[in-house]
């Protein structure tokens, strides 16, 4: 398939600090001809000099903070091929981004949030829950010793930024864990600071491998980030807060992860149980790994997207 992939800010580079921004692009390149265009776009006339089968706007495109970048693109409709958008950064210019998708008559909305259905209805297009997954070449089982009971790496999202039952959740979990009962790896900093960042994906992935349990919680708008799948693919036990509506049945307590209540009322009990029941822990870890490796890698996401594009292009099939 010939794909025009439109992005911004060189976020598809392997050297970009968030590698998952470019994982779909790199996966699509393996079996398709992908033409990459980076930057704001006003018309398509000068960027497509060969037959294009579809257009994909990547995550980086929706990191732009100028509302003027979310206008109608001249010539896009005239290409008469399926157009897909990976909606991103919902806290910034969300309405402008939705209007961009609407006025450009996109065919497929890819949204990692539970809002994918309502956003698709507003735009008037197909919508797909498109999880931010992980690359099993990086996040994989390693033959390293488990030296931590529990690990975490990421921004704290404190200072009341998140409202409701998950308010200051990561800070609250940390305070609960620093009583000295367990050996923990906790690398975090306040919102807006990148001091917590581990220098390389390899080092970060190894820290997950070195931990028996890894904490991953929903983000500022109850979003599910790639850490969930990074942990599963690493064969470490995923510990996450209980959000059944947002999880849509994908993350199930005692099956492929362990969930705790947002008020932390059962956190100690669950940690004690699984840290002292290795057999039960390993069953969950194996279930999680098999689910992630078979359904939720970036290859799976790329295949899912290409199938949806073919459905849109040839609806009679």
For the regions a language model picked out, list residue spans one by one.
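Nucleotide-sugar donor-binding catalytic core of glycosyltransferases
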Residues: 1-74, 78, 82-229, 233-250, ...
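Residue-level signal for the nucleotide or nucleotide-sugar donor/cofactor binding architecture
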Residues: 226, 262, 296
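Hydrophobic, well-ordered secondary-structure elements that form the walls
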Residues: 231, 257, 288
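Glycine-centered loop/turn motifs
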Residues: 253-255
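Conserved acidic donor-binding segment of nucleotide-sugar-dependent glycosyltransferases
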Residues: 257-263, 274-278
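A charged, aromatic-enriched C-terminal amphipathic alpha-helix characteristic of glycosyltransferases
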Residues: 278-309
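Generic C-terminal helix-cap and adjacent flexible tail
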Residues: 310-317
């Amino acid at each position: 398939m010939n794909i025009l992939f439109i992005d911004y800010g060189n976020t598809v580079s392997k050297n970009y600090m968030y590698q998952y921004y470019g994982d779909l692009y790199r996966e699509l390149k393996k079996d398709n001809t992908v033409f990459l265009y980076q930057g704001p776009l006003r018309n398509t006339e000068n960027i497509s000099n060969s037959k294009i089968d579809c257009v994909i706007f990547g995550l980086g495109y929706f990191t732009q903070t100028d509302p003027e970048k979310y206008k109608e693109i001249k010539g896009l409709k005239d290409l008469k091929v399926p157009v897909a958008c990976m909606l991103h950064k919902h806290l910034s210019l969300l309405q402008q981004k939705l209007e961009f998708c609407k006025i450009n008559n996109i065919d497929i909305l890819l949204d990692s949030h539970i809002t994918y259905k309502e956003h698709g209805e507003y735009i008037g297009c197909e919508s797909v829950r498109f999880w931010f997954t992980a690359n099993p070449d990086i996040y994989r089982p390693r033959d390293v010793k488990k030296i931590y009971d529990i690990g975490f790496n990421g921004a704290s999202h404190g200072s009341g930024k998140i409202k409701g039952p998950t308010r200051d959740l990561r800070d609250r979990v940390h305070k609960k864990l620093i009583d000295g009962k367990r050996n923990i790896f906790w690398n975090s900093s306040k919102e807006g600071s990148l001091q917590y960042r581990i220098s390389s994906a390899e080092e970060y992935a190894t820290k997950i491998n070195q931990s028996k349990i890894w904490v991953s919680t929903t983000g500022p708008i109850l979003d599910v980030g790639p850490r969930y799948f990074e942990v599963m693919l690493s064969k470490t036990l995923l510990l996450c807060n209980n959000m059944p509506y947002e999880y849509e049945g994908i993350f199930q307590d005692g099956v492929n992860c362990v969930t705790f209540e947002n008020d932390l009322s059962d956190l100690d009990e669950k940690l004690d149980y699984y840290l002292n029941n290795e057999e039960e822990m390993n069953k969950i870890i194996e279930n999680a790994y098999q689910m992630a490796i078979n359904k939720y890698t970036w290859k799976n996401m790329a295949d899912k997207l290409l199938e949806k594009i073919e459905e849109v292009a040839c609806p009679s099939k």
